[in-house]
Amino acid sequence: MLKLIVETKTLVQSLGFARSVVEKRNVIPEYANIKLSAKDGNLELSSTNMDLYLSQKIAVQVLSEGEITVSTQTLSDIVRKLPDSELTLTELDIMKLEIKGQNCQFNLFTLPVSSFPAMDSIKPEVSFKISCADFAKIIESTKFSISLDETRYNLNGIYLHIKDKEFFAASTDGHRLSISWITLEEKIKNFGVILPQKSAEEILKIVKDLKNIHEDIEILLSSNKIKFICNENTILLSKLIDGTFPDYSAFIPKSSISKLVINRKIFADSIERIAIITVEKFRAIKLSLSRKTLEISAVGEARGNAKEIITASQDKESFYEYNCDESLVIGFNPQYLEDVLKAVKSNLVELYFSDISASAPVLIKFPQNPKDIFVIMPVKV
């Protein structure tokens, strides 16, 4: 029967990842539980919502091997409130788990291990390794433009695809398009899958963790599943969205008549300030561009109006340059611009305008991050 000693802070972190995977309102009791398996000096924590399956191994002192399942939320709530010290977990012979800490004791009800699902197998058609940092970069650069419209299920995730030696991530909600990619060390089979939003969020948390960010992640792809192996001790298996992602290359503007280059932080801060005046029903800001100035303005129903002026400058910290003699007035949803400007940490940002009528999509690039590009549709103002 299971008995082990574990560091509280180590268990807290792993339970945090597990709890995030488990659905809060799970009607099937077994899926609201976490399976704890103690063996060979490790504690394996398994959690699932049937679309995602997470397995984590942490080093513990195993006094007696065994496995049980217990409520993920209850165990997590208890352990998070305990001081940083050692905990002793002991399986009792009456379907209970005993948790002993400093001057405290809890007995939790358990469910049979036989009722907990096993992780599905995967027959990968493609597998490769990249750094966790690179993977985090392409997910963070695309996750914000995933469509939330469930009737367009093929847009409810990130399109991960391989073309020659490039590994791409792309997402769109019909109003904006985000593309980010990295170069692989060797050429592998072209392949494409749609990773659900929930799965993207969970694997991003894992790869950004301090113990993983400087390690590699192995990615295994099949037609209906994707498997991530991170730092050898963490495995995430996810179902994929069964659909076809649109050929987004047709939506990327091929030419432009003018270009704005501006300090990213100054641009982002100004947009954020002016956007305060806008209302949720119709969020729009107006950019009035000329060689000398950029005016950012907005009118908010029942709120008032606001404007801010940025003047032309070649100084690195306040750079602004618009390369066309003819002025341009164009409107955007400020949230769309803010999302892009927060996703890529670059000193400068470039906006390419292909239509003086301000109705054509706008291409956004970052000189210091050439493998991230974005397209945003303007709005009427």
UniProtKB/Swiss-Prot annotation:
Query: Which GO molecular function, any one, fits this protein according to its record?
Result: DNA-directed DNA polymerase activity
- Domain of life according to the entry: Bacteria
Q: Which cysteines are joined by disulfide bonds?
A: none
Q: Per the UniProt entry, what is one GO biological process?
A: DNA strand elongation involved in DNA replication
Where's it found, cell-wise?
A: Cytoplasm
Q: Name one GO cellular component term.
A: cytoplasm
Family annotation (CDD domains): beta_clamp
Q: Which UniProt keywords apply?
A: Cytoplasm, DNA replication, DNA-binding, DNA-directed DNA polymerase, Nucleotidyltransferase, Transferase
Indicate where this protein is primarily found.
cytoplasm
InterPro entries associated with the record: DNA_clamp_sf, DNA_polIII_beta, DNA_polIII_beta_C, DNA_polIII_beta_cen, DNA_polIII_beta_N
SMART domains linked: POL3Bc (SM00480)
Query: Its biological function?
Result: Confers DNA tethering and processivity to DNA polymerases and other proteins. Acts as a clamp, forming a ring around DNA (a reaction catalyzed by the clamp-loading complex) which diffuses in an ATP-independent manner freely and bidirectionally along dsDNA. Initially characterized for its ability to contact the catalytic subunit of DNA polymerase III (Pol III), a complex, multichain enzyme responsible for most of the replicative synthesis in bacteria; Pol III exhibits 3'-5' exonuclease proofreading activity.
Subunit details: Forms a ring-shaped head-to-tail homodimer around DNA which binds and tethers DNA polymerases and other proteins to the DNA. The DNA replisome complex has a single clamp-loading complex (3 tau and 1 each of delta, delta', psi and chi subunits) which binds 3 Pol III cores (1 core on the leading strand and 2 on the lagging strand) each with a beta sliding clamp dimer. Additional proteins in the replisome are other copies of gamma, psi and chi, Ssb, DNA helicase and RNA primase.
Question: Belongs to which family?
Answer: Belongs to the beta sliding clamp family.
Q: What is this protein called?
A: Beta sliding clamp
Phylogenetic placement of the source organism: Bacteria, Pseudomonadati, Pseudomonadota, Alphaproteobacteria, Rickettsiales
Annotated gene: dnaN
